[in-house]
Amino acid sequence: TKSMLMIKQILTNLCLTGLLTLSIACSNKPAELEVEQTTFDLGDVRFRDGVHHISTSFKNIGDSTIHIRKILSDCPCTTGETDKKTYPKGTKGIIKIQMDLSSFFPDSITKKVRIYTDSPIREYEEITIKCKLLSN
């Protein structure tokens, strides 16, 4: 009957509206950090070379703002910092890393720095720094 037909049309329109709304919501990409360079090989390094400074850029490739929660390393000899903690979509930043190997013995060394964010895609991005520490 006519009332059943109207109910079907209303339900169809509601379903189509819901699907359209869902597809628009899903088209937004969550906040995500993309680091330009994640591995550094410094080669042969001497004790007397002092503190090593490394930097790399990153970009928020998502459609919403990303927040840097913390930057941690696997060793107190290595630290990292960014110039700010909040990056709107499409913006770039730089992480500056300092590595002081003066207390280490000659050996192959690998250090890791993690940038923790509020991205739902990945909890952190990791940067790896390698070198071979030589005696003076």
What are these regions (language model features)?
Residues S3-C15:
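Bacterial N-terminal signal peptides that target proteins for export
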Residues N13-S23:
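Bacterial N-terminal signal peptides
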Residues C26-I61, L133-N136:
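Beta-sheet-dominated interaction scaffolds and their linkers
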Residues D49-S55, S102-K112:
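Short, solvent-exposed loop/turn segments enriched in Ser/Thr/Gly
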Residues I61-S64, S103, S119:
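Short, acidic/polar linear motifs in exposed loop/turn regions
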Residues D63-K92:
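Surface-exposed binding patches on compact interaction domains or structured appendages
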Residues I95-S103:
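Short, hydrophobic beta-strand segments
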Residues F105-L133:
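Terminal connector regions
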